[in-house]
Amino acid sequence: MSHLFSKACQYFPGGVNSPVRACRAVNITPPIVARASKEVFVDSLDKTFIDFCGSWGSLIHGHSHPKICAAIRQGLERGSSYGLTSEQEILFAEEIFSYLGLETNYKIRFMSTGSEATMTAVRLARGITGRPIIIKFLGCYHGHADTFLQEKPFSHTSLETLDLAHPLTLSLPFNDFPLFQTVMNSLGHKVAGVIFEPVCANMGVILPVPGFIEGVIQTCQQTGSFSIMDEVVTGFRVAQGGAAALYHVKPDILVFGKILGGGLPASAVVTPKDIMDHLAPEGKIFQAGTLSGNPLAMIAGKVSVNLCREQGFYTQLATIEQNFLSPIEHMIRTTGIPVTLVRYGSLFSFFFNPNRPNNLADAQLSDIEAFQKFYQSAFSKGVYLSPSPFEASFLSAAHSMESLDYAQTALIESLEQVFSLV
């Protein structure tokens, strides 16, 4: 254990300020970051890592992008926080509306974290419908509000574990539309909203089966429940209009975060006006935040989104993904090792199971011990994947061919080592 991590453990629970950073799922001592640039970070022991976590998907342009850094420095001279509406918020809202192609009947509310945004989405759904129940899907992560932490391992101190006659949250298997439809036929009149990730990223990368997302949204329309699409991970990453554009759907409520802030804390809820105007001060549903719409986060976010709009940006990401992951897929296929590499855009996950998972139960069939050995080998070679078998890893536009070639070789060698192919 490093001296700095020992010191961190004196001050922070587990030495971290967010649990997965402790790297216990992969059984390593977590690195303490000293600095970062482009696709790499350097730890306190002066070891360089190629970063495929990227602040959990926030850094699609890599660390310390010069345009984002310059904008933040310039903005800082005008103030770091106002507690008032600023020009930066308005300019950023205009940028987002233009980027997403939103109609004029939409509105946005800025916040600081994804958890705040999903919590606000649920408050809107319950407040407008007057209904108590929220439906989510097993393995999908929507932040640490009690409403979302019904199942293990998160439920230990959740409100939902209390002995309530009627649970306020129902968790159903992802991709099981017949079961979802059965539940909605029975309880739809009590369901305020259904929240879902269009592409799961917190049980590894799991894709929706054809028709699942469309069916969920259509069923919500039929029952008067709100469809809440959590695009904290997929928004601004998988396409210009996010997953909603790729699947050609219009959920009632959209939630964004991560890339939205350009590396600083920012999130947003986007809805049609007739929904958003129920929020205070226009309506009676309360939501507030001291740092909501922080001017520096708005500045960084505007530059981040503007960079995503550059000609060929998503084509470049797709090329990076193809060149990096296809040879690894080929190695897995030709050797017959029991591993499945799932990728979607610039997200990817290794499941140590020969079968592609469709839900949390499938994902949990992964050989965790084998994943840990694979992870530890890659880590020792200076390749930093997201440190859990149930988290997505991420590519960025900053990943150079040199770094990708090195990491590709390191990952293939690590797979060979785990399965004694060398």
Swiss-Prot record:
A single BP term in Gene Ontology: protoporphyrinogen IX biosynthetic process
Pathway: Porphyrin-containing compound metabolism; protoporphyrin-IX biosynthesis; 5-aminolevulinate from L-glutamyl-tRNA(Glu): step 2/2
Cofactor dependency: pyridoxal 5'-phosphate
Compartment(s) where it occurs, according to its Swiss-Prot or TrEMBL record: Cytoplasm
InterPro entries attached to this UniProt entry: 4pyrrol_synth_GluAld_NH2Trfase, Aminotrans_3, Aminotrans_3_PPA_site, PyrdxlP-dep_Trfase, PyrdxlP-dep_Trfase_major, PyrdxlP-dep_Trfase_small
Reactions accelerated catalytically: (S)-4-amino-5-oxopentanoate = 5-aminolevulinate
Alphabetical UniProt keywords: Cytoplasm, Isomerase, Porphyrin biosynthesis, Pyridoxal phosphate
Domain of life: Bacteria
Main localization, broad class: cytoplasm
Annotated CDD domains: OAT_like
EC number(s) stated in the UniProt entry for this protein: 5.4.3.8
PROSITE patterns tied to this protein: AA_TRANSFER_CLASS_3
Modification type N6-(pyridoxal phosphate)lysine: residues: 258
Primary enzyme class: isomerase
Gene3D superfamilies associated with the record: Aspartate Aminotransferase, domain 1 (3.90.1150.10), Type I PLP-dependent aspartate aminotransferase-like (Major domain) (3.40.640.10)
MF terms in GO: glutamate-1-semialdehyde 2,1-aminomutase activity; pyridoxal phosphate binding; transaminase activity
Cellular component terms (Gene Ontology): cytoplasm
Alphabetized NCBIfam families for the sequence: hemL, PRK00062.1, PRK00615.1
Quaternary context: Homodimer.
HAMAP family xref list: HemL_aminotrans_3
Recorded family membership: Belongs to the class-III pyridoxal-phosphate-dependent aminotransferase family. HemL subfamily.
Full protein name: Glutamate-1-semialdehyde 2,1-aminomutase
Source organism of the structure: Chlamydia trachomatis serovar A (strain ATCC VR-571B / DSM 19440 / HAR-13)
